[in-house]
Amino acid sequence: LLATIVYILAKQEGKNIWNFNKARHWEIGRNPFEAALLIGGFQISLMIIAGIFFGFGESPYSFTPIGITTNIVFVTSTLIGIELSRAYFIKKGSLNRKNLTLIIGIVTIFFVMLSITPSDYTYLLFKDLLPSIKFIGETMIPLLAMNLFACYLAYLGGAKAAIGYMGTLQAFQWFSPILPDLDWGIAALIGTLAPALGFIIIQNSIQLTTPGNRKKRYKTKDPALSWTAIATISV
């Protein structure tokens, strides 16, 4: 329902929020969607490699036919609704490029807060220091990094690109029968480092090549410096 409403609103306003390409040349994949899939796969690879050293555990989700079907419907509908909404907010807010960094920051925080259950907000009160620190390191910081990256992908390529990244991670989380059983510190590091590296890789890939073999970065005011600073501090 959310996806339908957002898509209709975008159509009425003449905004393409599903699939576009702001960069003229890509060196990682052929378009933002393929780049997002590759970065998502890279993050999963890091988790699997870490799992080899720290162990694996069984998935907590149901793998009965009914359970799988229910989860597919739930994950797919939620993912499409969230990413279409993300792309719509980014597209609407990025009409004025002077406010682009602020818009991406606001949208990121909004979706991070949306991802946290009401009971988890009690950790942010710091009544018990260690669980609060663990929650921030294990959940908040990776969510911040991944949502920042998803917003950046939505800015470059629309909802389809963001779905390519977030959908890859969701598919692994929900439909893999075994999952890496990682210490919260390792999980936090991977969840923050992978999107940060993905951001750097994409920043270096969207360049224009001139006839004189001189490369010029794609000229657009994006939150590169702010994003990199936040990601570095998070790591």
Predicted segments, located by residue:
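Functionally important transmembrane alpha-helices
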Residues: E138-I206
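Function-critical hydrophobic alpha-helical transmembrane segments in multi-pass membrane proteins
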Residues: S62-Y121, F135-F149
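Internal/C-terminal transmembrane anchor helices
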Residues: K219-V235
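Alpha-helical transmembrane segments
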Residues: L1-A3, N31-L46, I104-F111, A229-S234
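Hydrophobic cores of alpha-helical transmembrane segments in multi-pass inner/ER membrane proteins
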Residues: L2-E13, F74-A87, M146-C151, G191-Q207
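Aromatic-anchored segments of alpha-helical transmembrane domains
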Residues: G40-I49, V107-S119, M166-I178, V235
